[in-house]
Regions:
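Exposed, low-structure sequence patches enriched in small/polar residues
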Residues: 1-198
């Protein structure tokens, strides 16, 4: 019989600041746990597929995820200019990952706790209205997105660290007149992935 006792903790914190009706800053934090499931804990080999054997790890700890978020937006009611920005950071302690070992044609999978997972994401959107009074309600919008993920896996008991960087830039034009509602947008993206084990 495999058994574990876990204590769940869910801390949260929030801060909201509105210096003006059209400006807002939000900061938040939350933490959460994630328990391993029964199959991840059970120390009994599952050889249903003799070439892919699975066995649990009764010593697994539960994961704990930290998540931070910062958001800001401002809107000018006279010019319709707006800015929206957000940053999100998260990291996981004792992340549960598959540990894969290959011996000949047989692959054995078990589970381990690792540290080092980190994720960062941000976006900024800028709305620039046309100054021409005849184009009131129309605007040029520019958006930038960035993300970075560092993940950890185990291959033949060795840590494989994956780093993924993604960037994207978008721009669009929205035309909004009495009889015309038209929009066009273009986007360019870049993605780079690196592994510590090739």
């Amino acid at each position: 019989v495999t058994g574990q006792t876990y204590t769940n903790i869910f801390p949260t914190a929030n801060f909201n600041f509105t210096p003006a009706r059209s400006k807002n800053l939000r900061i938040s934090y939350n933490g959460r746990t994630n328990q391993p499931n029964v199959s991840q804990l059970q120390n009994v080999p599952d050889a249903t597929d003799t070439l892919n054997i699975r066995i649990g790890n009764p010593s697994l700890k539960q994961e704990f995820n930290h998540n931070f978020n910062i958001g800001f937006n401002t809107f000018n009611v006279l010019t319709f200019k707006f800015i929206a920005a957000n940053i999100n950071l998260s990291t996981t302690k004792n992340k549960i990952v598959s540990s894969i070992t290959t011996r000949g044609p047989v692959q054995t999978t078990t589970y381990e706790n690792v540290n080092g997972y980190f994720r960062a994401f941000s976006f900024v959107t800028l709305g620039l209205p046309f100054k021409n009074p005849k184009m009131k309600g129309s605007s040029i919008n520019v958006t930038n997105n960035m993300s970075y993920v560092k993940d950890v896996s185990l291959v033949n008991t060795k840590q494989n660290i994956t780093k993924n960087i993604s960037l994207s830039q978008g721009a669009g034009v929205n035309i909004n007149k009495e009889k015309i509602d038209f929009g066009v947008k273009a986007n360019i993206a870049y993605n780079n992935v690196k592994y510590s084990i090739n």
